[in-house]
A protein has these predicted regions:
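N-terminal hydrophobic targeting signals that begin at the initiator methionine
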Residues: 1-2, 17
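Sec-dependent signal peptide recognition
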Residues: 2-9
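Second-shell loop/turn segments in exported
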Residues: 29-37, 71-75
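Periplasmic peptidoglycan-binding/anchoring modules of Gram-negative envelope and division proteins
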Residues: 32-62, 86, 123
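Periplasmic OmpA-like peptidoglycan-binding domain that tethers envelope proteins to the cell wall
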Residues: 65-124
Length: 124
C-alpha cells in the first residue's frame, strides 16, 4: 500500500520527534482544526507516559499554525490547539500544574502540515 505524501511526511516527522531522546513530541493538526485524531492521541499518550515517569519535570505545550488565517486568528487557533493537547495530557494523568501552555501563531520556518502542530517538550 502506498502512503499519500502528506501521511508519509506526518509519519516521518512524528518518528523524528519521538526518537530524538524522547523529550520532544509533536502533534499535527488538519488545516483550521484543533481536533485530535488517533495518531495525535497516540503521541500525546506517549508524552504523558514519559512525563509521568519523571514527575519533577516540567511540560511545555507550544502551539503553532500555518499562515492560512489572519495573524490574530492564528494566535487564537494555536492557543486552542495547545489547550486541547494540554487537556489530553491531564486526562492521561499529567498534573495540570506541571503544564506551561503557549500559542505562538504562525511559523516562519515551515508551511503546511509541519506548521500546524503542537510541540510537547518535557524538561528534566
Amino acid at each position: 500500500m502506498r502512503l499519500p505524501p502528506v501521511l508519509l511526511l506526518l509519519f516521518v516527522l512524528s518518528a523524528c520527534a519521538l526518537f530524538g531522546g524522547g523529550r520532544k513530541y509533536v502533534v499535527f493538526f488538519q488545516e483550521r482544526s484543533a481536533q485530535l485524531d488517533r495518531q495525535a492521541q497516540s503521541v500525546i499518550s506517549g508524552a504523558a507516559a514519559r512525563a509521568n515517569t519523571n514527575p519533577a519535570s516540567s511540560v511545555k505545550v507550544i502551539g503553532y499554525t500555518d499562515s492560512a488565517g489572519s495573524p490574530a486568528a492564528d494566535v487564537a487557533r494555536s492557543q486552542q490547539r495547545a489547550q486541547t493537547v494540554a487537556d489530553a495530557l491531564v486526562a492521561d494523568g499529567v498534573a495540570a500544574n506541571r503544564l506551561v501552555r503557549e500559542g505562538r501563531g504562525q511559523t516562519r520556518e515551515n508551511s503546511g502540515v509541519a506548521s500546524r502542530r503542537v510541540e510537547i517538550i518535557i524538561d528534566p
